[in-house]
């Protein structure tokens, strides 16, 4: 019975370890924790202060010296933080506010955002182009365009939700639970086979 318990514990540790799909970034948790003095400034929650604290500038200098890749991701607002959204304008202004010059040259190419963790969605193919030799093109060429009726919009302007400029929402997909991870684990059939063999 003790051998069975040991096997179950070992198999469950294999199943639960390392199954989450995570994107590898140059930012470690210790790098982000040393950058915490700047989080209020780059998220816009510093109470309207336009200058970062001395501790923030010191941590930015340390981060650019030890982890330029992580600093670039933070300064270009391309790393999601658990504390809130990064205001890209404030993040790009941080090096100048700390009297370090502009955004480092190494960060200029870091303007592309990271993909969200999880599966890649299927893309819808664009509609086919109408060529001059297709039947649809000859019918379209023979008709004259008509004026479309004006849409019913109020004279005040468009109605609908307004967005705040400078704040970019980040969609964070839910992480799979332990049950979902273990059901897709390749070690699950091995666990069942070992349990059957131990019962024989």
UniProtKB/Swiss-Prot annotation:
InterPro entries reported for this sequence: Bifun_inhib/LTP/seed_sf, Bifunc_inhib/LTP/seed_store, LTSS
Listed CDD domains: AAI_LTSS (cd00010)
Coiled coil: none
Membrane topology type: Lipid-anchor; GPI-anchor
Expression sites by tissue: Expressed in seedlings, preferentially in hypocotyls and roots. Also observed in siliques.
Keywords tagged on the record: Cell membrane, Disulfide bond, Glycoprotein, GPI-anchor, Lipoprotein, Membrane, Signal
Glycosylation site residues: 87
Stretches the record annotates as Disordered: 134-182
Lipidation (GPI-anchor amidated threonine): 177
Propeptide: 178-200
A Gene Ontology cellular-component term: side of membrane
Knocked-out gene: effects: Female gametophyte disrupted development arrested at the four-nuclear stage.
Entry keyword Membrane: yes
Low complexity bias: start-end ranges: 140-163
Disulphide-bonded residues: 27-72, 38-56, 57-98, 70-107
Signal peptide: 1-20
Function: Essential protein involved in female gametophyte development. Probable lipid transfer protein.
Record family assignment: Belongs to the plant LTP family.
Protein name: Non-specific lipid transfer protein GPI-anchored 16
Organism: Arabidopsis thaliana (Mouse-ear cress)
